[in-house]
Each structure stands twice: as structure tokens, then as C-alpha cells.
Amino acid sequence: MTQATGDARMPDEESDLLQIKPLGAGQEVGRSCIMLEFKGKKIMLDCGIHPGLSGMDALPYVDLIEADEIDLLFISHFHLDHCGALPWFLMKTSFKGRCFMTHATKAIYRWMLSDYIKISNISTEQMLYTEADLEASMEKIETINFHEERDVMGVRFCAYIAGHVLGAAMFMIEIAGIKILYTGDFSRQEDRHLMAAEVPPMKPDVLITESTYGTHIHEKREDRENRFTSLVQKIVQQGGRCLIPVFALGRAQELLLILDEFWSQNPDLHEIPIYYASSLAKKCMAVYQTYINAMNDRIRRQIAVNNPFVFRHISNLKGIDHFEDIGPCVIMASPGMMQSGLSRELFESWCTDPKNGVIIAGYCVEGTLAKAVLSEPEEITTLSGQKLPLNMSVDYISFSAHTDYQQTSEFIRLLKPTHVVLVHGEQNEMSRLKLALQREYEADASTDIKFYNPRNTHAVDLYFRGEKTAKVMGSLAAKNSEVGSKLSGVLVKRDFKYHLLAPSDLGKYTDMSMSVVTQRQSIPWGSSLSTLELLLDRIGAGCVEVLEAERKLRVFGCIELTVEQKIIVMEWQATHVNDVYADAVLACIMQSELGGTNLKGATKQTKSEDSRFRECLIETLQDTFGDNCVPKMFEGDLLPVTVSGKRAEINLETLAISCAEDDVLRQMLNTTVQKLHQTLVSAL
């Protein structure tokens, strides 16, 4: 198994090559989009945008693929860097495949992207899609339940809980027996409302996993929450405004639960308002209240008493026009990286006052304002181009529900995949993680895991060679076959599985039906049927069978010939063997007609009117079987023969023998007649 450096070879249906190519999230965080190609199937994993870019620049490198060739598209969760380009891809490209996500993801996807459209600080011409495109894309998205197994065009897949955010899923994908697990963003730590990512029950051959935090180790949840609430309390008690930039859905709900509980425990803070500032605030919370059953046991137990998402100390704020900035307060505003929208407006309004503070509570992508302020520059540039001093405090506490090094390593150890492909991580963090994992598993003799960290548009090529086996079914399976014996049937391939069936069983086990093609050939012929029999018998002794009742010949057991009005009509069922026999018969007849075989004398001798043949035949029969074996007088072409009380008849026109009483007698008569016939022909 190797890692390719180029893309010269592309996997097809019969190839053993599995190709994994990041079109986004390759040594970067943002615009997650991973392409899988194996056994002729093409699958896209996520279709996001880059938060630090805008317009077409924010898209994955989808110009390197043909959208109409993609069979399946899986969306892991509703964050913009994983689904932000989906409406554009579904509505503005030639994609004709099927798109899957969980129910909660689909419900939140609509509102998240609606908010993104409204707050995007770019011109209409640069917008990737409109509200109408977003609405239309909903009809093209199918939903899947957790642990529900699906089979589409031979690709089997199942969704598993990923933690991270509500509805986030890992996808286990199986193609031709090879299993690939795509984690998306996941967290192995349970928080206040979400379950931890589960470990799928089967081992994948390939694990495609995020590497956002590289080798970092997260602080304990309790310590993180205490540090967060202490910072918020410090800012508001000194008379400042506390800004917490978040995305409308995801970590926002976790932080709201923490703040509401902390305010309840501290009566001295009750006069200080907390605002959840998002145009989608009410809609978002309605979605969370709907999908309570997708959350952890703590929330499900609490809902029996009261809904934890009906907050006592938090108010919704639709926009800055509805906000009276008259004193200390806490505002959670979107978007999380402050590229535009309400969080950007509030930051620019408050950044000059040292009493105020901003708490960055999630991962920040390079090129965003949130990432820039973490380095605490002396001044910032507003959206209008104005320079403002940065006097407010800046703190970073990671509530981002991504795995740290310990969680990632433990997850790999539990699954024991053969290959691990790292995506969704900055180049340096990803490289450090790869080296750390290699060192850890090199020392473990019980595992042999290979690690990869491809850049965007660079493919990882893996080869999986397996034996192809066919399952014998139907009437073929009912036969008692010995070891080493040969079986003949129709090999049926379906969903990368092979079955061997008798042709008659096709309709029972498949959607196919069997058809028979009968070939018919007409050839000019100037002689009789008996002459034709004599001619064809020269191809091979015993290859000609006379069907007296139908006045036709059967050659090689598969080709039937009749002579009608100086035309030979030849019929056979088309198979590769029968066609060869038919060619031989046709060549023999054509050679005779063209003068290559002299049978004119034979034609005269075999006519029923020829008295010499009759006389010779009667004399021969009497010498062989006795004088009384044939009557002294008879009429027509049928000569009756009686031997030891058993009756037979010889057709003097076709030379066919009929004897129902004794097959041995029939064969003896046939030999006598044929030898006499050949002797008379040879004498001419």
C-alpha cells in the first residue's frame, strides 16, 4: 500500500485503488470537502466554505472534479466550514447524486445558512447563493437516523454520534468490503448537553479524522468553565461589557447553559443582563428544544422537570437596533469569528474601552478577525477601513468540541484502523500530530498503522487486493458437487458481490430475465433430405440424428435442418458453441453446392423410386435376418421388417429406422441400411 504523489491513475470499477483527495481541509481548517473514489464509486464528504475567505474563493477546489459523476454526498454537521457551500453545489452545479445528513443537521442547516446569507459583508454579485437557492436545496437533502444502515448503489453506510454539536454524525462507509470511517468534527468528551462521540462496533480499514488541535491537551471541563465564568464576572463587575462571539448554533447553547446556571447561583449578578444576540435566536432555540432526545442523559432527565433551554437570566436580542447600551452586560453574538455581523459591530464599538472584554470561546481560522485579536495588536481595522486602538481585554478559552491529542489517540487505539488520514488541521498542528502518533504506534508491536496528512488536491492512494469469491445459489447449489469439479452457470455481480446461478434461476434471484435467440439460415439445396444426411454424416460419424416424425435432421444435438422446396432451413439456439457447429454445417453444405463434394450419384441412389436400392436392401435384410423378415409385397416408402417377433420400419426416403420395441434391433437395421447406402454410392 502506497501513497501516490500524482493523480495520473484514477480508480475504476475493477481497480484495487482507493483514492482519498481533500478538496478542502487538507492541511487547513475550513471548507471541508473530501473526495473518495473506489470501485467506480465517487463520494464527497462535506461541502463547506472557508470562514476567512469570501465569494468563489471560499469554495473547496471543486473545479478539479466532475459534479455529475459524484454518487453520494454526506454532510457531517451544520457548521459553515462543513456545509456552507452545499446550496451552491446542489443548485449551481451538475450534481445528480444523493445527499444525506441527520434530521437535526437538516433542520439547523436551513437557519444557519439563512443567517450566513444575511450577515455576509459582500456584494450580491459575489454571493454564492440566495435564500431561494437555500430553500430549493432542502428538497434535495435526504435524512438518516443514527445507527440506520442504508445501501445505495452498492455503497453501504451508517451514521454514528459524533458529539461536537447537535446532530453531528460520523459516517461508516463500506464499498466492496472495504470500510472507511469519516469522523467529521467530533468530541470524545461529554459536555452539559451533548453525548460523547461513540466508537463504531466494527473496525474500519481507513479512518479519516480531524486534527484541529494537533498535539494539544484540553483542560478539564470544570476548570475551563470556572475560568470562563470568572472572566465574565470580572468584566461586568468592573462596569464593562463582555462580548462572546459565537455562531448562532453549536457552542452557543453550551455557553448559555453555563451562564444561566452561574447567574442563578450568584444573586449579585441578577441586575446585569445577558443577551443572546442572533436574528435566529428564537428559531435556533426551538430546534434545540425539539431535538432533546438527541442530547445526553443529563438533559433528558432535566427535561422531565423543566426545559433547560428555557433560560431565566438570558434574553434574546434580534439586532443592535434593539439594544440599549447603557451599562455592564454580557452579549453572545454571531458570527463566531467576527468577520461581519453583530459580533463585529459590537467589537468595533467596544474595543477602545479597557473596562470591556472579549472572550474567544472557539477555534479561530487564519485570516479572521478573531484569530488576529488573539495576538493582541495595538489597533484593529474596522470594516469601513478606520483604525481603532485595541484597549479591551482579550481572552481565549476553548469550548470548541474537538478532540485533543489524548482523545484522538485513544479513538485510534480502540478502532485499530490500517490507515489514518488526517484532515481539518493547520499545517503545523497536523504535522506535529502525525509525528506524535507515528512515534506512539511505532513502539506498539501489536499495531501496524500508517498515517497520512495530504494537502489540498493531493491524493492518498491506497491499494486493497482481495480474492473474488462467488456464492453458488439456486438449482446449482442443490447439486452434490465434488471438490475440484467444475460448475457452469451465469456469473451475476451485484453490489460488489458475485453469485453463480443456473440460467433458469435468473428470474428468481435477480431482476433479470433469460432470453433465447434462435438463429435461422436458409440455403439453396437441389437434393433430398437423405442426401443431406449422408453429406453431414461425413463431418463426424454419429453426429446426425433423423427425426422421422418431423421429417428433419438434428446435427450435433443442437442444429435442426429441414428441406422444403429446394431450400434447407437451418435453425439453432445461439450460443458460442452452437454458432461454431452451425458454421461447420453451413460450410459443408455450401462446399457441396459449389461442386466441392460429388453427391449426384448418391442423390439418385437414395430416391425411394430406385428399384435397385430396394432390391439390394431386401436381399441384404433376408441374408442377415432370414427370408421371412420382409414381406414379399409392400407399398409406399415404408418397408416393414420383423425379426424374432419384433417389428420395425425403414423409411426408404429418409433411411430413418423406427422400432419402439427393441433399440438394439433399430441400431442393427440402421447400420445395415447405412452401410448398404454408402456401398452403392461409392460404387458410382
Curated annotation (Swiss-Prot):
The active site is at H402. It comes from the Eukaryota. The keyword Metal-binding applies. Gene3D superfamilies: 3.40.50.10890, Ribonuclease Z/Hydroxyacylglutathione hydrolase-like (3.60.15.10). Zn(2+) 2 binds at D81, H82, D185, H424. Its main location: nucleus. SUPFAM superfamilies: Metallo-hydrolase/oxidoreductase. GO terms for molecular function: 5'-3' RNA exonuclease activity; metal ion binding; RNA binding; RNA endonuclease activity. Binds 2 Zn(2+) ions per subunit. One of its GO terms (cellular component) is mRNA cleavage and polyadenylation specificity factor complex. Pfam families: Beta-Casp, CPSF73-100_C, Lactamase_B_6, RMMBL. Keywords: Endonuclease, Hydrolase, Metal-binding, mRNA processing, Nuclease, Nucleus, RNA-binding, Zinc. The keyword Protein biosynthesis does not apply. It is found in: Nucleus. It is an enzyme of class 3 (hydrolase). Zn(2+) 1 binds at H77, H79, H164, D185. Its cofactor is Zn(2+). Its EC number is 3.1.27.-. GO terms for biological process: co-transcriptional mRNA 3'-end processing, cleavage and polyadenylation pathway; mRNA 3'-end processing by stem-loop binding and cleavage. Component of the cleavage and polyadenylation specificity factor (CPSF) complex that plays a key role in pre-mRNA 3'-end formation, recognizing the AAUAAA signal sequence and interacting with poly(A) polymerase and other factors to bring about cleavage and poly(A) addition. Has endonuclease activity and functions as an mRNA 3'-end-processing endonuclease. Required for the cotranscriptional processing of 3'-ends of polyadenylated and histone pre-mRNA. Belongs to the metallo-beta-lactamase superfamily. RNA-metabolizing metallo-beta-lactamase-like family. CPSF3 subfamily. Component of the cleavage and polyadenylation specificity factor (CPSF) complex, composed of at least Clp, Cpsf73, Cpsf100 and Cpsf160. Interacts with Sym and Cpsf100 forming a core cleavage factor required for both polyadenylated and histone mRNA processing. Interacts with Slbp and Lsm11. This is Cleavage and polyadenylation specificity factor 73.
